């Protein structure tokens, strides 16, 4: 393989730049030309493809976001649109493509693979909701961002004896809510996988008040309900002073953590190795701290599961 390309797609995640850097540097080490596709699949369609040099990825490993930029591209589902994207790659002699993103990005990569472009997927999303890997690029950084916010919110919650509801990302997966709730000592965590009755939460807070507890933190994943909705429901059962904190897109930003930089570097390098070995239609991952590879179709046919033992522990420690 003489030429490959790399793109980032879907929601940005801290560490994507580190993954791009690893792909570029690893490929160049083996004298493979690398092209960067700007603005994700939209860039493939628009032929926004540029040759990368070693210096192109210099001073990028510590930067958040993605310098290749990203864009949603629903029209990529259209076979005629993909034909144009494939033609653009073929005209440049590009044989392989590395796609960094989430589930939707993987589906685009799978279609390209079926249509003749050798593809490898790298999991890049803060939600940690992709099968075939224990952790996704960006999850650790987002987790640290949320925990830092919870720590600061707890200071003011304690000062004013309030109940704070912290809304975090996670439409279908509760990993961010669970992990940040456990690390931040939250009194209650609401995950899409475990939809608690708000009355149960209210009873728990009331029991804490009766024991002398002056403040509480509730972490709710956006896929369960909004923080505002949670607060309104809570007031139906208990008279507490509540405040809502929606962390929003700040969870996606910031310099990637050391763990995310290392993970991204390992996965980026491994993706190039697979293409060099003519292996394709695969997503790379990390399982039990070892590099792994999974067929795209196997990722789509399995369901992401919350760590139930950790969920039980969170409940046990939040009495």
Swiss-Prot record:
TM segment ranges: none
Location of this chain's protein in the cell: Cytoplasm
Positions bound to Mg(2+): 103
Annotated catalysed reactions: beta-D-fructose 6-phosphate + ATP = beta-D-fructose 1,6-bisphosphate + ADP + H(+)
Family annotation (PROSITE patterns): PHOSPHOFRUCTOKINASE (PS00433)
Pfam families documented for this protein: PFK (PF00365)
Binding site for ATP: 11, 72-73, 102-105
Keywords tagged on the record: Allosteric enzyme, ATP-binding, Cytoplasm, Glycolysis, Kinase, Magnesium, Metal-binding, Nucleotide-binding, Transferase
Homology family: Belongs to the phosphofructokinase type A (PFKA) family. ATP-dependent PFK group I subfamily. Prokaryotic clade 'B1' sub-subfamily.
Assembly notes: Homotetramer.
Protein name (record): ATP-dependent 6-phosphofructokinase
Species: Macrococcus caseolyticus (strain JCSC5402)
Annotated gene: pfkA
